Structure formats: structure tokens, C-alpha cells
Design a protein with these regions (language model features):
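Nucleic-acid endonuclease domains
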Residues: 1-37, 42-203
Length: 203
């Protein structure tokens, strides 16, 4: 279990600190190269992993992460609770908050996976690389170099650079929430319907 704390330590975490305080969450300590959710929600003996995101009220979109690959999406799929909050610059939350669960996030994940696999009008996807790789294999291209290229395309080359989540997606698919008590009631109700009674069952 992560060590609870109610304060993140960098200035960039100012909005997350407000979310953590508002909803009575336990923050994860610091940041590292390995992905970890932002906080934990404790509710009647159960612990839920929480990802915190904010959206500039003027821009109406949410930043996610750099270098999003299939691996990152699979990590996101394990997150049990997503909380989204709007803010006005510099860092004042407006009071508009939504909670989303895995099934509400799944269409977004699938959209990202489709872009990684198929590409877009301007950028290649893994399907394009696999087509090119087949042609290189057919002409006897050096296997060592080919393996390096394959690794690069699968782990970096076709990654998405900070794909945004539209605020409209959050508002349409999420449940509005205004307090720590209300959040816990929504989470408890959702996971009770799913037949989950504790954190381990939800993973």
C-alpha cells in the first residue's frame, strides 16, 4: 500500500493538490519513470486507485501523457477511478468535477489504440510499419537492423504525443461529483453493481 500523503511537492501539482484535498484522497508520493496512478481512494475498507486530470475551462480538453503506446493504455485500463476537474488560470478549480470508471473510459482507449495501429492521414501506424517490414524481409534486409527498427516502431515510433481528451467526452460519459462523500457513494454504488467488494477484485 502506498504511504498516504495529502500534499504533492512540485508547483505543477497545485491543481492535483486541490483535487486531493477536496475529495479526501491519499496522494501517491512523487513521480517516477514508472507509471503509477496519482492517488488512492479509501472507502469502507476498500482501496481504489485514482487518476487525476484537469482541464483549462477555456481550452476544453485534457492533456494525458507523452509517448502513449499500447503499454500505457493497458496501464490506464487498470485504473479504477478517474476524476476530472475544470480550472481557470492559473490554478483555481471551478467546481465542475466528473468521475469516470473503466467502462466509460474504454471507448477512448479503443480510439487511441486504433490510431496507433492504423495511423492517421499524416502519420504512420503499426499496420504501415508491418507492411514495410514484410517488404524488407522479402528483399533480405539485415535482420539485426530490422529487429531494431521493429522495436523502435512498436515502442516509440508509433506512440501518440499527448493525445487529448475532449471535455465534452468527460461531461457526456461521466458522473458529476461535488464532494468527498458524494464521490465515495458513487464509487461504492458502481463497484457494487460490478460485483466487486475490494480493491484486489477490481484489478
Amino acid at each position: 500500500m502506498p504511504k498516504p500523503t495529502t500534499l504533492r511537492t512540485t508547483q505543477d501539482d497545485a491543481r492535483e493538490n486541490q483535487q486531493i484535498a477536496k475529495f479526501g484522497l491519499a496522494a501517491r508520493e512523487g513521480r517516477s519513470n514508472k507509471y503509477t496512478p496519482d492517488a488512492d481512494l479509501l472507502c469502507e475498507g476498500a482501496q481504489y486507485e485514482v487518476e487525476l486530470k484537469t482541464s483549462d475551462v477555456a481550452k476544453k480538453q485534457i492533456s494525458t501523457a507523452r509517448g502513449v503506446t499500447f503499454k500505457k493504455i493497458e496501464e490506464w485500463r487498470k485504473v479504477q477511478v478517474w476524476i476530472f476537474s475544470q480550472y481557470e488560470r492559473p490554478n483555481r478549480l471551478t467546481g465542475e468535477n466528473y468521475v469516470l470508471f473503466p467502462e466509460q473510459m474504454e471507448p477512448y482507449y479503443k480510439k487511441l489504440e486504433d490510431k496507433i495501429q492504423k495511423g492517421t492521414k499524416k502519420r504512420a501506424g503499426l499496420d504501415d510499419w508491418n507492411y514495410a517490414k514484410s517488404a524488407l524481409v522479402a528483399i533480405g534486409f539485415d535482420n539485426t537492423v530490422l529487429n531494431k527498427l521493429d522495436y523502435a516502431f512498436n515502442h516509440k515510433g508509433c506512440a501518440l504525443n499527448d493525445p487529448k481528451i475532449p471535455w465534452s467526452y468527460v461531461a457526456t460519459n461521466g458522473t458529476r461529483v461535488s464532494s468527498a462523500a458524494e464521490l465515495r457513494e458513487i464509487v461504492k454504488r458502481y463497484y457494487s453493481r460490478q460485483g466487486f467488494t475490494n480493491r484486489e477484485q477490481c484489478l
